[in-house]
Amino acid sequence: MSALRCSVCSAPLHPDGRSLRCVRRHSFDLAKQGYVNLLRAGVDAGTADTSEMAAARADFLATGRYAPLVDVLARVVEASGEPEFVVDAGAGTGYYLAGVLDRVASAWGLALDVSAPALRRAAKAHPRIGAVVWNLWEPWPVADGVADVVLDVFAPRNTAEFHRVLRPGGLLAVATPGAGHLRELVTELGLLDIAGDKTDRIAESLGDHFEPVDVDTASHTAELDADEVRKLVLMGPNAHHLHRGGLGAKLDALTGATEVTFEFDVSVLRRKE
Ligand SMILES: C[S@@+](CC[C@H](N)C(=O)[O-])C[C@H]1O[C@@H](n2cnc3c(N)ncnc32)[C@H](O)[C@@H]1O
Ligand SMILES: [Zn+2]
């Protein structure tokens, strides 16, 4: 709570019954599901994950297939010293932030995401998570220099705000899909090419504000049953394109197991002064 700022006037926010309020009496309702919406304006349709995508994401992540990425992120947070506050930008259902907080008992976490259905889940994912609906492209409703670590897992990157909310010397971890991520499904199902920016491109784009510390890659393969493949596809951007190339029909027709490659790159950067 002490890290949050009013999205109208930037004053600190305080709990007041079922809302958060600043000294100028700007007020934001706490949803009964445990998150707060600080947005003042709407966001473009199609930006936020839908409740179907959030449900598919929660179900798929519960299989543990992406657990190696939690390990990498937790190691980054542990390496930051004795972290007290971790911000997850585009936290989705809170899976990664909750996994990190399980490992780092000293820290509290803030989940920022524009998707209310995803944040309902994030708010319940861990007792030390606070969840705020926000558009990452706007200045964040977060005080200067309060975060020990910012996580960004497959989410939009706002360099200026990463820098502003991090303390001096704080760490930024940017996770992106590696070159081989889900390559079997890209071939067999014709998925959108989900490969993220190359890590040198990420370091370059953040270079004015951050110096690169490390790039960690985690990769493994697993046999997925048809139901897991469906969830994996429906939790991401392909969910918006089920008619393209008959993707929906291909998913319906799936039976048996598919070998799938998972590959994650995590760029670790340190905030420059
Ligand atoms: C691919 S998902 C990743 C979610 C989570 N980090 C994970 O890996 O499970 C991208 C997330 O970014 C969120 N998102 C997209 N654009 C956003 C924006 N402008 N502001 C805030 N969140 C945004 C979506 O709602 C979604 O939860
Ligand atoms: Zn205010």
Predicted regions and their residues:
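N-terminal auxiliary segments of SAM/dcSAM-dependent transferases
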Residues: 1-47
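Conserved class I S-adenosyl-L-methionine
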Residues: 171-201
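A short glycine-rich, Lys/Arg-flanked "PGG" loop and its adjoining helix->strand segment in the class I
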Residues: 159-171
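Class I SAM-dependent methyltransferase SAM/SAH-binding core
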Residues: 85-87, 92-139
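Class I SAM-dependent methyltransferase Rossmann-like catalytic core
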Residues: 46-72
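A short SAM/SAH-binding and catalytic strip from SAM-dependent methyltransferases
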Residues: 147-161, 176
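Conserved Class I S-adenosyl-L-methionine
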Residues: 216-273
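A short acidic, Gly/Pro-enriched loop at the edge of an enzyme's catalytic core
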Residues: 138-149
